[in-house]
């Protein structure tokens, strides 16, 4: 496992890290999939969850079996999704990412239908809605059944993931860019093995501490934004460049 010093060195030599972010419980303040299951699924979903938690099955099989236990109309599902709060600091963090032109991707075992609806309600559109920067499981509603598919589950995936975050990270960074990962759950544990800088909370933070994975604890995206500004020299370099341009403009005027 790479040390914090090695990670910091890799970040320091690059002006364009790639940022990868989980969705459920990270961008949102609670796990939307768990809420759907808790409110709309047969109680036996918890037994399937336990199989996944102890490592007997991967997240793809887990979600496939669990969502088959859900019975709900589109209206019921949408009503639940629309009540999910997101991190109040996420929009500001995303503006920083956009201004600095940092590649940003959402990687989730959760479902595209849910993610797009939550982000749209929060006024977040553009590239996170169009599919090029969103990698998630697929969901569609037919009657009172929820049908799933897994377009980003690598074949073969040694861990049986619904979305193979590690493989996507390797492919998108192409070995040329340092990788930042932001997450909160056990489904993120394989992604942190690829990342150069990790921001973790809840179960992922516990996992990182138990496994000796260097990480930065956080509760909100305000903390992630502050830490990134301190870690990444591009922030200071960019600011100096802007100040220099502004100064030249004042002299000319």
Identify the meaning behind each predicted range.
Residues 2-123, 133-138:
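Alpha-helical substrate-recognition element adjacent to the catalytic core
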């Amino acid at each position: 496992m790479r040390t914090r010093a090695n990670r910091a060195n890799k970040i320091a030599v690059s002006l364009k890290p790639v940022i990868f972010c989980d969705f459920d419980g990270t961008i949102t303040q609670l796990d939307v999939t768990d809420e759907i299951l808790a409110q709309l699924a047969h109680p036996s979903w918890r037994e399937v969850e336990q199989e996944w938690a102890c490592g007997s099955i991967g997240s793809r099989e887990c979600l496939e079996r669990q969502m088959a236990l859900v019975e709900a109309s589109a209206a019921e599902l949408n009503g639940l999704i629309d009540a999910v709060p997101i991190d109040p600091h996420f929009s500001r963090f995303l503006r920083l990412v956009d201004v600095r032109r940092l590649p940003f991707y959402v990687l989730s075992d959760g479902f595209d239908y849910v993610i797009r609806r939550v982000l749209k309600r929060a006024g977040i559109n553009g590239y996170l809605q169009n599919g090029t920067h969103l990698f998630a499981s697929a969901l569609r509603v037919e009657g009172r059944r929820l049908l799933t598919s897994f377009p980003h589950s690598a074949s073969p995936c040694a861990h049986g993931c619904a979305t193979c975050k590690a493989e996507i990270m390797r492919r998108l960074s192409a070995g040329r860019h340092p990788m930042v990962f932001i997450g909160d759950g056990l489904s993120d544990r394989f992604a942190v093995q690829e990342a150069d800088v990790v921001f973790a909370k809840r179960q992922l933070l516990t996992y990182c501490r138990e496994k000796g994975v260097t990480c930065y604890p956080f509760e909100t995206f305000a903390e992630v934004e502050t830490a990134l500004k301190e870690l990444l020299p591009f922030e200071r370099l960019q600011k100096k460049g802007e100040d220099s341009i502004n100064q030249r403009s004042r002299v000319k005027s």
